């Protein structure tokens, strides 16, 4: 509640700024994250004493919508909402199969500094990381789901020409988990 109050006070204070301009935007692209499938396969192999084969996704889609508030021509603030597709892994052990799937969503807030056609940004995010796993043994399927939430930092940059942009953003600690980072490469437009 305190964070929301501070944000509302900040917006109220800044709306009187004569150079202020608010634009909306959308970005879409690919996000890479390491779901540590190799480590999981090794744990399963050690526990079962069997060879484990596995397949996993290294990337999935991500979309982001945002509001861009210009304090000046060089300094902006962005408030965004992002959502990813799922990263999946499948493990096979002599007649049994295990799967896991992860996706994320959240909000982010960043200060963006523009220099000519190049921009850099740094800020923070509050995100939720959702996981689902299933294990099939002898035709019986066992399932579990879990969600964690938390915050982390983000840094990125890119090129913006004529209200279109191409960029890269690194999100740390997705869902508050220190081992869950992601890299987002995108194409976007500002309206």
Can you describe what each PLM-predicted range is?
Residues 66-70, 110-114, 156-160, 169, ...:
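Transmembrane beta-barrel domains of outer membrane proteins
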Residues 1-23:
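Cleavable N-terminal export/targeting peptides
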Residues 29, 78, 84-86, 94-99, ...:
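Detector for outer-membrane/organellar transmembrane beta-barrel domains
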Residues 19-84, 113-117:
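Short glycine/proline- and aromatic-enriched beta-strand/turn motifs that initiate or cap beta-hairpins
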Residues 57-63, 83-85, 101-107, 114, ...:
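Residues that define the transmembrane beta-barrel architecture of outer-membrane proteins
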Residues 21-25, 29-32, 113-115, 159-163, ...:
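Outer-membrane beta-barrel "beta-signal"
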Residues 34-57, 85-104, 126-149, 174-178:
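Flexible, solvent-exposed loop segments that connect beta-strands
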Residues 25-31, 78-82, 121-125, 167-171, ...:
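Transmembrane beta-strands of outer-membrane beta-barrel proteins
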């Amino acid at each position: 509640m305190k964070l929301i109050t501070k944000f509302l006070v900040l917006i109220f204070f800044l709306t009187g700024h004569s150079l202020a301009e608010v634009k909306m935007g959308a970005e879409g692209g690919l996000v890479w994250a390491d779901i540590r499938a190799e480590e999981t396969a090794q744990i399963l192999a050690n526990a079962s004493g069997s060879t484990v084969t596995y397949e996993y996704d290294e990337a999935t889609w991500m979309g982001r919508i945002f509001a861009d508030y210009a304090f000046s021509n060089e300094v902006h603030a962005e408030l965004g909402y992002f959502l990813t597709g799922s990263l999946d892994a499948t493990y096979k052990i002599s007649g049994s199969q295990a799967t896991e799937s992860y996706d994320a969503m959240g909000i982010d807030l960043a200060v963006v500094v523009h220099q000519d056609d190049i921009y850099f940004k740094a800020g923070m995010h509050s995100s939720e990381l959702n996981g689902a796993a299933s294990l099939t043994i002898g035709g019986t399927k066992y399932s579990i789901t879990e969600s964690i939430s938390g915050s982390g930092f983000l840094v990125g940059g890119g090129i913006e020409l004529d209200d279109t942009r191409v960029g890269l953003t690194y999100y740390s600690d997705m869902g508050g988990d220190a081992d869950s980072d992601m890299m987002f490469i995108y194409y976007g437009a500002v309206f």
